[in-house]
A protein has these predicted regions:
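C-terminal "cap" of GNAT-fold acetyltransferases
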Residues: 170-191
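Short, cationic low-complexity segments
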Residues: 194-195
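Acyl-donor binding region in acyl/amide transferases
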Residues: 79, 85-173
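Short, His- and charge-rich active-site/binding loops that engage polyanionic ligands
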Residues: 59-92
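Short acidic (Asp/Glu) patches
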Residues: 39-45, 49-52, 78-90
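Short connector loops at helix/strand junctions that flank enzyme active sites
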Residues: 51-53, 64-66, 95-100
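Short amphipathic alpha-helix that is part of the acyltransferase structural core
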Residues: 1-47, 57-62
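Short beta-strand micro-motifs in enzyme catalytic cores
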Residues: 52-56, 98, 172-176
Length: 195
């Protein structure tokens, strides 16, 4: 499947694609994963979307949004610090201009798998490295599930837990700190040189 992966602010995308992303999030988080989250007109939008985040949109050849990720600096409000501080075991959330938060990862794939992640997801993770290099990001923090943590490790991405797992809703939830270098080492393998 031919895909295009772009990262930009809301203003850099067509409004229809942004709304399609919000609908994808509702399908994945509310419908498929069973999260108890509010939706508006079939779209999952939260207060952090009003703070000028960057979005990764993954689109297929027909320009349909198949996946997304939200990226935000940690210097302002963010999910880990302000919504899920219980995942930090009483410690302060990582904050700094070189530390960004990843949230609202949602994807619909065609079923192709690579080490537990679809090829599409692996390409998206590689784009996180490119974005980090462009923005001077050295670390990402994220609130995710223990299952995703296992998949990251199986892929070879070293992660650091910021606290103990906590059951939130239907998920065993964990906060992770991931260096960009760890992502790069695991998923951005150099191409072999032709002889």
């Amino acid at each position: 499947m031919h895909t295009a992966i772009r990262i930009g602010t809301r203003q850099e995308f067509d409004n229809n694609h942004i709304n399609e992303m919000y609908r994808l999030r509702a399908r994945v988080f509310r419908d498929r994963m069973g999260w108890d989250i509010p939706t508006i007109a079939g779209m999952e939008i939260d207060g952090y979307d009003a703070l000028g985040p960057y979005y990764m949109l993954i689109q297929d050849a027909d320009r349909r949004v198949r996946g997304c990720w939200r990226l935000m600096p940690t210097e302002g409000p963010n999910m880990l610090k302000d919504t899920f501080p219980q995942l930090l075991d009483g410690r302060e959330a990582p904050v700094g201009r070189h530390i960004w938060e990843l949230s609202r990862f949602a994807i619909e794939t065609d079923g192709e798998q690579t080490f537990g992640f679809a090829d599409l997801t692996m390409h998206a993770i590689q784009e996180l490295v490119t974005f980090a290099d462009r923005m001077g990001i050295t670390r990402y923090v994220t609130v995710t599930t223990a299952a995703i943590e296992r998949l990251l490790r199986r892929t070879g991405i070293e992660t650091t837990r910021l606290g103990s797992p906590v059951k939130i809703g239907v998920e065993r939830t964990i906060a992770l700190d991931i260096t960009v270098d760890a992502i790069r080492a695991a998923v951005c393998k150099p191409m072999p040189v032709a002889a």
